[in-house]
Swiss-Prot record:
Subcellular location: Cytoplasm
Gene Ontology MF: a single term: structural constituent of ribosome
InterPro entries (UniProt xref): Ribosomal_uL5, Ribosomal_uL5_C, Ribosomal_uL5_CS, Ribosomal_uL5_dom_sf, Ribosomal_uL5_N
Role of this protein: Component of the ribosome, a large ribonucleoprotein complex responsible for the synthesis of proteins in the cell. The small ribosomal subunit (SSU) binds messenger RNAs (mRNAs) and translates the encoded message by selecting cognate aminoacyl-transfer RNA (tRNA) molecules. The large subunit (LSU) contains the ribosomal catalytic site termed the peptidyl transferase center (PTC), which catalyzes the formation of peptide bonds, thereby polymerizing the amino acids delivered by tRNAs into a polypeptide chain.
Family: Belongs to the universal ribosomal protein uL5 family.
Keywords assigned by UniProt, alphabetized: Cytoplasm, Ribonucleoprotein, Ribosomal protein, RNA-binding, rRNA-binding
Protein name (record): Large ribosomal subunit protein uL5
Any single GO BP term: translation
Oligomeric form and interacting partners: Component of the large ribosomal subunit (LSU). Mature N.crassa ribosomes consist of a small (40S) and a large (60S) subunit. The 40S small subunit contains 1 molecule of ribosomal RNA (18S rRNA) and at least 32 different proteins. The large 60S subunit contains 3 rRNA molecules (26S, 5.8S and 5S rRNA) and at least 42 different proteins.
UniProt xrefs under Pfam families: Ribosomal_L5, Ribosomal_L5_C
GO cellular component, one term: cytosolic large ribosomal subunit
Amino acid sequence: MSTEQKAQNPMRELRIQKLVLNICVGESGDRLTRAAKVLEQLSGQTPVYSKARYTVRTFGIRRNEKISVHVTVRGPKAEEILERGLKVKEYELRKRNFSETGNFGFGISEHIDLGIKYDPGIGIYGMDFYCCMTRPGERVSRRRRAKSRVGATHRITRDDTVKWFKSRFDAIVR
């Protein structure tokens, strides 16, 4: 074992738990409905509307008014959409895009860069990508019966995700 490299523990492998796509329009109505169509075209799933938590008079937002849409994508579809989003960013993110718990996010300014055909009836929308990472065995902290904590050595850190991101996508982190 000393001459050959030690085998990696399969329980330590990082994987994508979910990818959340969010478009915040800042107002309810027709623009929000068109943004929902964009997310439905991209993900193939029905998006969910999010409400404002409190009134902001300067922006003209009232409490409980629907102001954004988001969709959660899991599995191979999440990896494929993330790949398309990173291609727009040219596989380059900043160190501050990665959280302390190992998740990362970024935004794009035009959805047509993802390969969706431009429709004048819909318009152009920017969107946020947020990717949550996980390891096998993390269910122990979420399950209902015999719940326990994930140990400190098994928790995902920013450095773990940056290393995974660089190797998986051959990307640059500034």
